[in-house]
């Protein structure tokens, strides 16, 4: 376990924030008349001698004198809080001619910014403090004491906030305003997005000790690969990591478009700007030297790569060489900190021809670029220890008679209810499209069409590749659907939740009403996805967060948790494919396996050797879930061709 708990200690601080700050002094008319930009500053919440809530701004260095601002009647604009930006407007003082002061916060770690804003809101609501003192009271009063850092938020303050429910005028996401010079539109928007309030966690989500160790290593600037079986919280941890890092200089990528969309990033190929990566190295370097692409490489300080198992070794080596060439640094990966996540025992790289794939850990540059490796071992997705043990055996390519018996017994499971049928996971995307189209056509009634609104329709193909929603969604009464975005975790409306369309609004947009397996019935409104195209261009798609769910591909299910699953393993063609499919299920009771063949359970021996080496060298745990049974387990390994 890594030491250096202090590296991550700041993650849990709610009253302090380090970021870029621009201080604007406004005229009485609201126009900026003086501006000071601070590349790095520390904001602290505290109180003065009269218990007034104050904000202290401290610039680095001995010359940076702290400034304190009273927070009475402060207004906070949080439309871009998820991107690490916010604006705090402080009202004018009683001094004649004085104007308001505006603090523009940027490059904040998004999670820390959210907690900072939540603390501010709770403190303002619980104890707004006395009004401003008169000049006479200030002269006759005690000498001002030093700034006192605010106390942590207390349970009583949370209860008071919930009980009073004062109108929240401080934390508001403002609607998008039309650009200057643009002609006003007379057409009503097809997909009006409801104004959402800033999402702030009611409590501090706790990381497990092994997850905290990964975060500490990242915050210390170490390049790291963290791995773990399906359901160990890799995706959740990756989002926590991204929320703890400054947005500037942090690039989130993944090997596939869907995985990239889940973490709010772009594909590794789109960031690199070298096309498919099949060209010779000199040509790849030339492609990366193009102005827009080159600047992306130069600005990158931390590169996140998710689903690393699907990145081929030759591509990784080329990217490493391109990084050194473009950045003109001979350090590993050009001095970029790598934060790599994935499980090599899941889906392998896609290759053409009969040649077996070469995994990233087989690349020449892997060891020098990734000095730290940590494994997550606690499974969060499944609660049944029997099912967890079964999945761990399948992950290692072990299919004993008991594992075979348990999986074959699921063929009789009735995994759907209330008109909701199981989603069938298919090995080939063509089967998915045909199944969903056929089942939709078989339903009686009218087809309801919902077209997406794309920020750039000419780049719809890029959005199709990276968004979990399609440009056109067709639904009927009784259509099987899946939620592809978290709407309300507490109510069970999460990514992967299964449901059935039970109606459509009679008025307005005719939005679908969906009854979910968790028992909730909800009218589904449009949501927005933002992806990054080649060259850093941001694209957005506005669409219902639904997709047809009679069938979906195993590749697109990677990283998801499904309520009820039906799997056919008869056409499994890659190592790890059976394991990925089986591990999507939340429970053994929600799983039905058809035509099970023990030979479908296999893994690549090179990956087993890689993990065994890590276990010996870094104390990684890769023991069998059942040591007594391990000796008799049959290991189905793909031959190395």
From Swiss-Prot:
SUPFAM superfamilies registered for this protein in UniProt: P-loop containing nucleoside triphosphate hydrolases (SSF52540)
Q: How is expression of this protein distributed across tissues? A: Weak ubiquitous expression.
- Subcellular compartments: Nucleus
One example GO MF annotation: telomeric DNA binding
State the reactions this protein catalyses.
Couples ATP hydrolysis with the unwinding of duplex DNA at the replication fork by translocating in the 5'-3' direction. This creates two antiparallel DNA single strands (ssDNA). The leading ssDNA polymer is the template for DNA polymerase III holoenzyme which synthesizes a continuous strand; ATP + H2O = ADP + phosphate + H(+)
Q: Which residues bind DNA?
A: 577-596
Q: Entry's Gene3D superfamilies?
A: P-loop containing nucleotide triphosphate hydrolases
Stored HAMAP family = PIF1 (MF_03176)
Summarize the protein's role: DNA-dependent ATPase and 5'-3' DNA helicase required for the maintenance of both mitochondrial and nuclear genome stability. Efficiently unwinds G-quadruplex (G4) DNA structures and forked RNA-DNA hybrids. Resolves G4 structures, preventing replication pausing and double-strand breaks (DSBs) at G4 motifs. Involved in the maintenance of telomeric DNA. Inhibits telomere elongation, de novo telomere formation and telomere addition to DSBs via catalytic inhibition of telomerase. Reduces the processivity of telomerase by displacing active telomerase from DNA ends.
User: What is the protein name for this chain?
Assistant: ATP-dependent DNA helicase PIF1
Protein encoded by which gene: PIF1
């Amino acid at each position: 376990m890594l030491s250096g708990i202090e590296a991550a200690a700041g993650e849990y601080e709610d009253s302090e924030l380090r970021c870029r700050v621009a201080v604007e002094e406004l005229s009485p008319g609201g126009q900026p008349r003086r501006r000071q930009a601070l590349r790095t500053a520390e904001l602290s919440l505290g109180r003065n001698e009269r218990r007034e809530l104050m904000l202290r701004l401290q610039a680095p260095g001995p010359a940076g004198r702290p400034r304190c601002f009273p927070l009475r009647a402060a207004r906070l604009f949080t439309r871009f809080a998820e991107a690490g930006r916010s604006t705090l407007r402080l009202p004018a003082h009683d001094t004649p001619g004085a104007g308001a002061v505006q603090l523009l916060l940027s490059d904040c770690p998004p999670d820390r910014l959210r907690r900072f804003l939540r603390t501010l809101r709770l403190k303002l609501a619980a104890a707004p403090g006395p009004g401003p003192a008169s000049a006479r009271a200030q002269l006759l009063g005690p000498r001002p004491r030093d700034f006192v850092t605010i106390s942590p938020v207390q349970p009583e303050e949370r209860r008071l906030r919930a009980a009073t429910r004062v109108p929240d005028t401080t934390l508001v996401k403002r609607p998008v305003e039309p650009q200057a010079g643009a002609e006003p539109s007379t057409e009503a928007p097809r997909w009006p997005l409801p104004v959402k309030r800033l999402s702030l966690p009611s409590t501090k989500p706790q990381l497990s000790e092994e997850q905290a160790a990964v975060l500490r290593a990242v915050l210390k600037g170490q390049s790291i690969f963290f791995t773990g079986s399906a359901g160990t919280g890799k995706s959740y941890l990756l989002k926590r990591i991204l929320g703890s890092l400054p947005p500037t200089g942090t690039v989130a990528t993944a090997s596939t478009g869907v995985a990239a969309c889940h973490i709010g990033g772009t594909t590794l190929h789109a960031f690199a700007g070298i096309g498919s990566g099949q060209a010779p190295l000199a040509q790849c370097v030339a492609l990366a030297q193009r102005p827009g692409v080159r600047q992306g490489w130069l600005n990158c300080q931390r590169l996140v790569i998710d689903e690393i198992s699907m990145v081929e070794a030759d591509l990784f080596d080329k990217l490493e060489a391109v990084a050194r060439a473009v950045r003109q640094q001979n350090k590993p990966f050009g001095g970029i900190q790598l934060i790599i996540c994935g499980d090599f025992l899941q889906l392998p790289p896609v290759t053409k021809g009969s040649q077996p794939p070469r995994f990233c850990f087989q690349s020449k540059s892997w060891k020098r670029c990734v000095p730290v490796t940590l494994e997550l071992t606690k499974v969060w997705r499944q609660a049944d220890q029997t099912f967890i043990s079964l999945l761990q055996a399948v992950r290692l390519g072990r299919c004993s008679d008991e594992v075979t018996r348990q999986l074959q017994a699921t063929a009789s499971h009735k995994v759907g209810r209330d008109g909701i049928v199981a989603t069938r996971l298919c090995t080939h995307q063509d089967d998915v499209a045909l199944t969903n189209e056929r089942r939709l056509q078989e339903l009686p009634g009218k087809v309801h069409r919902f077209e997406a609104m794309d920020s750039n329709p000419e780049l719809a193909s890029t959005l199709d590749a990276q968004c979990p929603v399609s440009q056109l969604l067709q639904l009927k009464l009784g259509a099987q659907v899946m939620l592809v975005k978290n709407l309300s975790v507490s109510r069970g409306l999460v990514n992967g939740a299964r449901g059935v369309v039970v109606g459509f609004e009679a008025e307005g947009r005719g939005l679908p009403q969906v009854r979910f397996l968790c028992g909730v019935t909800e009218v589904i409104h449009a949501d927005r996805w933002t992806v990054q195209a080649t060259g850093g261009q941001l694209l957005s798609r506005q669409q219902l967060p639904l997709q047809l769910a009679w069938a979906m591909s195993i590749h697109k299910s990677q990283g998801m948790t499904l309520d009820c699953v039906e799997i056919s393993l008869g056409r499994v063609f890659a190592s790890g494919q059976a394991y990925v499919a089986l591990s999507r299920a939340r429970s053994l009771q929600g799983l039905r396996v058809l035509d099970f063949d023990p030979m479908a359970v296999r893994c690549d021996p090179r990956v087993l050797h890689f993990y065994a080496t890590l276990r010996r060298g870094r104390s990684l745990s890769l023991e069998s879930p059942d040591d007594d049974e391990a000796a008799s387990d049959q290991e189905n390994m793909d031959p190395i061709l």
